[in-house]
Regions:
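Fe(II)/2-oxoglutarate
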Residues: 1-21, 171, 268, 284-299
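Short, conserved beta-strand element in jelly-roll/cupin
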Residues: 119-139, 186-189, 194, 245-248
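Non-heme Fe(II)/2-oxoglutarate
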Residues: 199-299
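Non-heme Fe(II)-dependent double-stranded beta-helix
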Residues: 1-21, 27-120
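Double-stranded beta-helix
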Residues: 137-204, 208-221
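Short, P/G- and charge-enriched loop/turn segments at secondary-structure junctions
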Residues: 115-120, 181, 228-231
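Short, solvent-exposed loop/turn segments at secondary-structure junctions
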Residues: 31-33, 99-101, 114, 137-139, ...
Length: 299
């Protein structure tokens, strides 16, 4: 299978088709240099504030819309319009978002379609995640690794056999060709990756110094990082990323929110988060539905 880079400077007639086929798209140049600097400075400031009291760090976490200067990253017209296209519906935001600053690498293929009990090659999944990357990863380590087309196939894991037995699905799509190839997504600062929550991915991808375009499995990357780190091409700057989840009104979104409601880490974020009137009005003007059910649930 050839390597695939699904990139767009602006919305395209092929964007939705490619998202459905490959499980992700890259939206290029969404943010200007001054916005990137502002977001990076704000993330660094808030991370340092959290670190001042290590024992309370988890108790102070909030969602991105609760930080006025960072909220602009999610309340972006081009980004929201793209999400509308991909979901073919009004996007719903329910408070699941976060930022990262120089986070310790955690590698391993997984998907985030929690509480999803449907067959991936017989149904669509109307929930996606965005990653706003605030430094270049086209030639350096630290970016996103993706399995193209993994959004529409069974993925090996501990829950797979249980699903096949329970729902009487066949093994025909279990080990397709796409499991033999993965890619390190080539993002530049200000790009946004949008991927279906069923798409298998891994964070903090490694690029080698001498084979920059070679994408390895996360297990091999962990070995190289620990024992052969001299082969790794470093990021070159502090790694800053913003993540957020959006969905369309559906039973799948309801199921996912039930999962989120019982996630200990997310409970803390929901409890601490608060959207001011300016954020609510801006979201409404962009056609974004802000669902504060989980925020109110844990107040």
């Amino acid at each position: 299978m050839k390597k695939v880079e699904i990139s767009y400077n602006k919305s395209s007639v092929n964007l939705v088709d490619d998202y459905k086929k490959y499980g992700y798209v890259i939206l290029k140049n969404v943010f200007e240099d001054n916005e990137i600097r502002s977001f990076r400075n704000e993330i660094k400031k808030n991370e340092l504030d959290l670190e001042k009291n290590v024992h309370r760090i988890n108790n102070n976490l909030k969602d991105v819309l609760s930080y006025p200067k960072l909220s602009k990253a999610l309340l972006n017209k081009e980004l929201i319009n793209t999400i509308k296209q991909l979901l073919n519906s009004t996007p719903v935001y329910f408070g699941q978002s976060s930022f990262r600053w120089n986070e310790k690498p955690s590698r391993g293929f997984h998907n985030d379609a929690n509480n999803d009990n449907e067959c991936p090659f017989q149904s669509e999944y109307p929930i996606l995640r965005i990653g706003i990357y605030l430094q270049d990863h086209d030639q350096t380590s630290g970016g996103l690794k993706i399995w193209p087309k993994s959004n529409s196939v069974w993925q090996p894991g501990r829950a797979l056999l249980k699903k096949i037995i329970k729902y009487k699905y066949s093994f025909k799509n279990l080990f397709p060709q796409q499991y033999l190839k993965n890619i390190n997504v080539k993002t530049k600062a200000g790009d946004v990756v949008l991927w279906n929550l069923r798409t298998a991915h891994s964070g903090s991808a490694i690029r080698l110094k001498y084979f920059t375009n070679c994408s390895l499995s996360p297990q091999i990357e962990n070995f190289i990082s620990k024992y052969l780190n001299f082969l790794v091409k470093p990021i070159g700057t502090e790694r800053a990323v913003i993540f957020s989840t959006f969905g369309a009104e559906s039973h799948q979104l309801n199921n996912f929110m039930k999962y989120a409601e019982n996630h200990e880490g997310l409970k803390i974020i929901f409890k601490n988060s608060n959207w001011n009137d300016l954020v609510i009005n801006e979201g409404f003007s962009l056609g974004l539905k802000l669902n504060n059910k989980l925020l109110e649930r844990f107040k």
